[in-house]
Amino acid sequence: MDLYDDDGESAQSEKVDVPSEESTIAGPETDIPAETIEENVPEVEENTLLEEDSLVDVDSPRPSQQRSKPSKSKRKRKRSSSGESSAAEPEIDAGAKVKGPLSNTNKEINVGTEFQAKIADLNLNDKACNEDRDDQDELIWNTPETIDDEKLEAFIRESSDRYLIPIDRALYILTINNFNFDSAIAEVARRNELKDVWTDQEITLFENCYQIFGKNFSQIRSALCHRSLQSIVQFYYESKKRVKYLNFVNSKCDDSSSSEETETPSPYPEAIFESMCDNCGEKAENMQINNAMNRPECRACLIYFNQTGVPRPTSLRLVLAERIRNQVSCPDNMKEYMKDFDKLSAQATGSTFQKRIIVKDQCVEYIIDVDKIPSSSCTENGNVGETSSPSAQKTEIQSESDGSGPLIWRHKKTVCMEEIEVLADDSRRKMFEACQHGSKVDIKLVASWKNDMTNLRKRVEQTYYDPDLNPTYLFSHDRVHYSQDWTQLERSQVIRCFNMYGAHFEHIADVIGTKTPDQVYQFYLENQKAIDAADEEFLADMKNPERLADMEEEEDSI
C-alpha cells in the first residue's frame, strides 16, 4: 500500500498480497490436479471487460490510492451424468495423506481406522464412572444355581395366592433376604397392599369419557372428580391390556358419521350451544339438554347423570363434605369396645381358650382330653387350608390340597374372633344345661298346678252366686269388708302364689279371693325374708328330682 504526504508524494510503500483468481479457486491445498479445477472456472466474455474499461473516470485517483479488493468469480457447476462425473474423477491413492478438511470438494466419505476417534476403554471397576449416575438399575431377580425349584414354586404360589403379592415383588423380597424362604415368607405376611377397586359405574363413566376426551386424563378427572389423577392413569394402564381403547375411538368416529346422516333439527334454540353449563358453570362447545333436570349441561355432566342418576359434583371438596355428612357414626354402645380395637384386632395366640379351661379342682369329674384347646386358626373343611399361628409349625402347601379342588386360604384369627367363638361355646353350653334342667321338671305336675290356679281364678271372677250361699252379698249395697287376719291356709297359699307369680300383688289377690292387693302387699313387707327363703327353697326343689318325687307323694297323700 502507498502512503502520501501533504505534497502528494509517495512517502512509503508496502506490498499487499492480493489474492488472485487462481488462489481463490484453488482453495485448500490438496493433491487434486489443476486440470480438474480449470474445468470449473467460468469463461469471462471480452465485451464485459471492454465495458468496464470504458467506464473508468479520468479524474479518479490513481490505482495505487485505492484499495484493491479481491475479485470474486462465480463458479458455475456443470451438470453431468453419474457416468461422466465418475469418469472425470482422478484416481486418488489410498495411502496419500489428505491435507484438506474431511469433507472435501468431491464429497467423499473417509473410511478407515485412521479417521476414527480414539476412545479409551471402559473400566467397570473404576468408581468414578458410577459416582454421578442417579439412574442406576437395581437387580430384582437372578436365579441362583443352588436354589430348590420345588421350594421356589411353593413360595411363589403361597405369596401370590395367599397374600396377593405380585410375583416379581415376591422374588425381589426373596432376593433381599438372601434366598431364605422362612424370613422372606415372614416379610411377605407383614405386607398388606390396598388395591384401588373401581366400581362398574366408574368404569363405564371412564370409558364414555375416553371416547370424548381421549388420553386427556385431566379432562377425564373432571367427570371423576372423586378420583385422583394418579388413580385414573393407573387404571388406564392396568386395563389397557384387557380393553382395547382404540375401539372406543373408532366407535366414536362411526357414531359421528351415522349422526350426520340421520341428523334432525333440534327444537331448542342455538343460543344454548354457546352458553355455560348450568351444573358445573363451564363453557362448552356442544351443550345438551338434560331432560330430567330440564337444563342445558355439558357432555361430561350429562354422562355422569345418566350413569349415576345424580348431578355431577363440581369439586372434590363438596364430595368429601357430603361423605362426612353421610358418614355413619359409631354407636354409643360400641365406643367402649372401640377403645380396645387394636387389642382385639391383634393376631390370635390361643390365650382366650387357655383362660376358659376348667382345671381339675373345679370339676366334679375330670376327664382327660374332653375340652382340648383349639388352634388359633380356622379348622379345615374339605379343601380349606388351615392358617396356623406364628408359633405353630408351618406345613407344606402341597399337603393341604389333593389337586382335585382349589386351595382356599383364610385369614388368620384375631383376638376378637377368639372371643366370639368362646362366647358362642358358652352360650351353647348354657342352652344345653337349661335343656337338661327342663327335662328334670315334671310337666304333668306343673300342668296340674296351672289348672288349680285357673280354677281358683274362675271361682273368684264368676258373676253368678247362689242366693242361699251369699244372700247378704246380693242384697246389700255396702262395701265388702275382708278380714285383716291371715289364717294358716291363707299364709301357705300366698307364699305358693309368690313362688309362681312373683311380686304381682293384684294377681295374687285375685287367686286367693279373700284379700285385697293392699293386704297382700302389706303381708309381703312384713314377711319378705320368709318369702325369699321359701322362693329359694322352691327353686332348689325344682332342680332336685328326688324332692319333686317327695312333693308328689305329699300331694297324693293329701
UniProtKB/Swiss-Prot annotation:
Residues 1-106, 378-406 are annotated as: Disordered. A zinc finger (GATA-type) spans 271-325. InterPro entries: ELM2_dom, Homeodomain-like_sf, SANT/Myb, SANT_dom, Trans_reg/Corepressor, Znf_GATA. Disruption phenotype: Loss of function results in a suppression of sel-12 mutant phenotypes, possibly by up-regulating hop-1 expression. Double knockout with lin-35 results in defects in growth, vulval morphogenesis, somatic gonad development and fertility. Keywords: DNA-binding, Metal-binding, Nucleus, Repeat, Repressor, Transcription, Transcription regulation, Zinc, Zinc-finger. Residues 69-80 have a biased composition (Basic residues). Residues 36-56 have a biased composition (Acidic residues). GO terms for biological process: negative regulation of DNA-templated transcription; regulation of transcription by RNA polymerase II. Residues 378-402 have a biased composition (Polar residues). SMART domains: ELM2 (SM01189), SANT (SM00717). GO terms for cellular component: histone deacetylase complex; transcription regulator complex. It is found in: Nucleus. Residues 107-192 form the ELM2 domain. GO terms for molecular function: sequence-specific DNA binding; transcription corepressor activity; zinc ion binding. Residues 193-244, 481-532 form the SANT domain. The keyword DNA-binding applies. Probably part of a large repressor complex. Interacts with histone demethylase spr-5/lsd-1. PANTHER family: REST COREPRESSOR, REST COREPRESSOR COREST PROTEIN-RELATED. Belongs to the CoREST family. This is REST corepressor spr-1. The lineage of its organism: Eukaryota, Metazoa, Ecdysozoa, Nematoda, Chromadorea. The gene is spr-1.
